[in-house]
C-alpha cells in the first residue's frame, strides 16, 4: 500500500501541473486529530477547477492516481439521483487498498464551500491566494449537543411510538418490516439518548464519531454487551428479546438524562411497555 505521503504527492503534483485546478483541499477524518489514523481512511480531496465539464469528457486523467479495482461516479447515476448540484465526484478503490473520494468543484463556488463546510477542512494548495485567513480543521460541528427539553421529549416520543411498529411487524410475522424499524429508527434513538447521557457526565465537547462508532470507549463491558445484544435479530424470539432490551436500556438512560437536566420523563413508557408485553404474550 502506498503511504499517505506518496498519495498526497500524487494528488498535489497533478494539481500543480493542471492549470484548470486552482485550489485543493483535504476533508474528513484525515484532518481530524481526534481520530487515530489507519489504512482504511479515505482520501477526501476536492479540486476547485475552472472547468468541471472538461474533466468529465473522459476518465483517462484519473489513471495517474493508480490502478483501480472499482470506481463510482455518484453524479452520473440514474437509480440514485445526484445531490451535489454543479459538483462532480469520483469514489475510487485502488488495487493497493487506498481509497479516494475526489470532488470537482467550480472555483466560483469556493466561497460558499468555505462558508458552509463542516469544519474538517485543510487547504493543501491555493494557487491564487484565494484564502486570506487561517483554516484550522476541527470537529466542533459534530460534538454532542445538550438537548433541549423539546428535543429530549421528541427523542422519547419517536423511540416509543416507532417501537409499536416493531411490535406490529413481529405480531404479523413480518420480520423484515420489524427489523427495519428497529435498526433504522428505534435503536438510533437509543444511541442518541445514550450519547446525551454520556455527554452530560463528560461534557459536551467531543464527538461520538460517525454512527456512534466511538461509544464503546465510554461504556463498561456489561453495558457494551447489553447494547450489542440488541443487534441479535436472527428469528422472532431474538427480535422480541432485542426489543425488550432496547426498552430497558432506553428507560435507564432517558431517566438519567431527565433527572440530570430536570426534564419531565414521559408517561407513555409504562403504557407502551404493557402494550408490547400483551402482544408478545398473545403471539408467543
From Swiss-Prot:
GO molecular function: adenylyltransferase activity; protein homodimerization activity
Main location: cytoplasm
Biological process annotations from GO: cellular response to streptomycin
Temperature section of the record: Optimum temperature is 35 degrees Celsius.
Domain of life assignment: Bacteria
Coiled coil: none
Enzyme class: transferase
pH curve summary: Optimum pH is 8.0.
Catalysed reactions, as listed in the record: streptomycin + ATP = 6-O-adenylylstreptomycin + diphosphate; streptomycin + GTP = 6-O-guanylylstreptomycin + diphosphate; streptidine + ATP = 6-O-adenylylstreptidine + diphosphate
GO cellular component: cytoplasm
Pfam family, one: Adenyl_transf
Biotechnology: Could be used as a selectable marker in B.subtilis if strongly expressed, could be used as a selectable marker in E.coli. Streptidine restores the antibiotic effectiveness of streptomycin in bacterial strains in which they both are co-administered together with a simultaneous overexpression of this enzyme.
Subcellular location: Cytoplasm
Enzyme Commission (EC) number: 2.7.7.-
Keyword list, A-Z: Cytoplasm, Nucleotidyltransferase, Transferase
Disruption phenotype: Very slight reduction in streptomycin MIC.
InterPro entries named in the record: Aminoglycoside_adenylylTfrase, NT_sf
Other known facts: Although this enzyme can be purified from B.subtilis, the bacteria is sensitive to streptomycin in vivo.
Assembly, per entry: Homodimer.
Known function: Mediates bacterial resistance to streptomycin. Adenylates streptomycin on the O-6 residue. Adenylates streptidine on the O-6 residue. Does not act on spectinomycin, neomycin-B or kanamycin. Specific for ATP and GTP nucleotides incorporating a purine ring. No reaction with CTP or UTP.
Protein name (Swiss-Prot/TrEMBL): Aminoglycoside 6-adenylyltransferase
Lineage, broadest ranks: Bacteria, Bacillati, Bacillota, Bacilli, Bacillales
Gene: aadK
Amino acid at each position: 500500500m502506498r503511504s499517505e505521503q506518496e498519495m498526497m504527492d500524487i494528488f498535489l503534483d497533478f494539481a500543480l501541473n493542471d492549470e484548470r485546478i486552482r485550489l485543493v483541499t483535504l476533508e474528513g477524518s484525515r484532518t481530524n486529530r481526534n481520530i487515530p489514523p489507519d489504512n482504511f481512511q479515505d482520501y477526501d480531496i476536492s479540486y476547485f477547477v475552472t472547468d468541471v465539464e472538461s474533466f468529465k469528457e473522459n476518465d483517462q486523467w484519473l489513471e495517474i492516481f493508480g490502478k483501480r479495482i472499482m470506481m463510482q461516479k455518484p453524479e452520473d447515476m440514474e437509480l440514485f439521483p445526484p445531490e451535489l448540484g454543479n459538483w462532480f465526484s469520483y469514489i475510487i478503490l485502488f488495487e493497493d487498498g487506498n481509497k479516494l473520494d475526489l470532488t470537482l468543484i467550480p472555483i466560483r463556488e469556493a466561497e460558499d464551500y468555505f462558508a458552509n463546510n463542516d469544519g474538517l477542512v485543510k487547504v493543501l494548495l491555493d494557487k491564487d491566494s484565494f484564502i486570506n485567513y487561517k483554516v484550522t480543521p476541527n470537529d466542533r460541528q459534530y460534538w454532542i449537543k445538550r438537548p433541549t427539553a423539546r428535543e429530549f421529549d421528541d427523542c422519547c416520543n419517536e423511540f416509543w411510538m416507532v417501537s409499536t411498529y416493531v411490535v406490529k411487524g413481529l405480531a404479523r410475522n413480518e420480520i423484515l418490516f420489524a427489523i427495519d424499524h428497529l435498526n433504522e429508527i428505534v435503536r438510533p434513538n437509543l444511541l442518541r439518548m445514550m450519547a446525551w447521557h454520556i455527554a452530560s457526565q463528560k461534557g459536551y465537547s467531543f464527538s461520538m464519531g460517525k454512527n456512534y462508532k466511538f461509544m464503546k470507549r465510554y461504556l463498561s463491558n456489561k453495558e457494551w454487551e447489553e447494547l450489542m445484544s440488541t443487534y441479535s435479530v436472527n428469528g422472532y424470539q431474538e427480535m422480541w428479546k432485542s426489543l425488550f432490551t432496547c426498552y430497558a436500556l432506553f428507560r435507564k438512560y432517558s431517566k438519567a438524562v431527565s433527572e440530570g437536566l430536570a426534564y419531565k420523563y414521559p408517561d407513555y413508557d409504562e403504557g407502551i411497555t404493557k402494550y408490547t408485553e400483551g402482544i408478545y404474550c398473545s403471539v408467543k
